[in-house]
Amino acid sequence: MGEKPAKFQPSGGKVRGVTGTYEHSIDAKGRLFIPAKLREELGVTFYLAMGVDACLAIYPQSTWDRFTEKFASLPMSQSKAMRPLFANAAKCELDSQGRIVIPQKLRKYAGLDKDVVIIGVHDRAEIWS
């Protein structure tokens, strides 16, 4: 039997997933408002990375730490599969107004211009154009 994956632990210590659908806009400086409910679930520091199907994934620190541990334990021959995830990721911290700056490279990858949808997907959120 395989090991069970760790459950997402928000800062309050209660086990729950990232949920909901939110429509917002990216401003001219590439900033995106993160809704209060998502901030509560994701924490103050999280990582933006290229997701599957041309979206951006927002990972809470705890999930990102699991990726890092897994990457470090892989043999060199298998670690190349995770290189793009780390090479294109950006550590994000919220500003005083609850916004993050999405780097241009990540906006271009996901085709993000102005209007976006943020959805909760269990242990992460995703940003879609």
Regions found by a protein language model. Give the residues of each.
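Flexible "stalk/tail and boundary" regions
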Residues: 1-31, 37-92, 96-97, 104-129
